[in-house]
Amino acid sequence: MEAGPVSAVVGRFAPSPSGRLHLGNLACSLLAWLSAKSRGGRIVLRIEDLDAERCPRKYADQLEEDLGWLGLFWDEGGSKGGPHEPYYQSECSGIYTESYKKLEAMGLVYPCFCSRSQLHAASAPHTSDGNVIYPGTCRGLTAEEIAEKRKKKAPAYRLMVPDENITFTDGCMGEYAENLLRDCGDFYLRRADGVFAYQLAVVVDDARMGVTEVVRGADLLSSTARQLYLYRLLGLPAPKFAHCPLLLASDGRRLSKRDGDQSLENLRARYTAEDIVGRLAYAYGLQEEPAPRTPESLIKDFSWDKVPKKDICLPEGLFE
């Protein structure tokens, strides 16, 4: 697999269509759009529906309609198509297999028979995004042990990582460093049911689509070291990263798709698109009052220097 052609700045929307968009998703999408468009860049829409059963196509269609309603238009991808198809991860298994086999040929992939409950029972430490840091239980299994375990259970597959520090400068959060072995651990490349893992899929897709900048939530900051390692192993150009602060409910809870009152489905009944965009711009420091705005009108006001570095609690009454 070769990286796609790069022309200036290429950002992306990469939502998982497992439900309707909420304010946190919208904020990241707005910042990604503004970051690219403020420098004359393009936006790719990729639908991250790796787990197709949890991500019915109707949600992807609704997601496109919602983004368009807000004025967050993209240049290629989704149902619009373009030169880097497919744009739905559920259609990319063959592409991921090619990169997976390269890693396998390096001797870095091994089968893992551990269940999530076993790892939690072992009190393994957790990464900052809540995942268990794998203690390497299956890393040294012999061929005989693997064959015996296969009789009882299909394995998932992990990538072996070195004891190495990965450092980078985040466009929003600044300097960041993680040790691959201590802070991340060997991580999944493929589930036992054959579905490829997020870490591999996003690296392969961002490279082949020519993405030069990844803007996403700060909850994914700790995924970046693993992804930079994959870019290096696969010989692919890595994009720049900017992780925006998470949007929290006024009581400090992290917003999720379960927060129906903050879903775009409900917000559209109470606010115009310009109302929502303007209020989000205010929450993220792009304007001094929550006045209605279009994304286009915010381009001249955008700067990462204005965006807070810490998670943002929605001001009481901003979205009633």
What is each stretch, according to the model?
Residues 21-23, 193, 270-271:
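Structural motif
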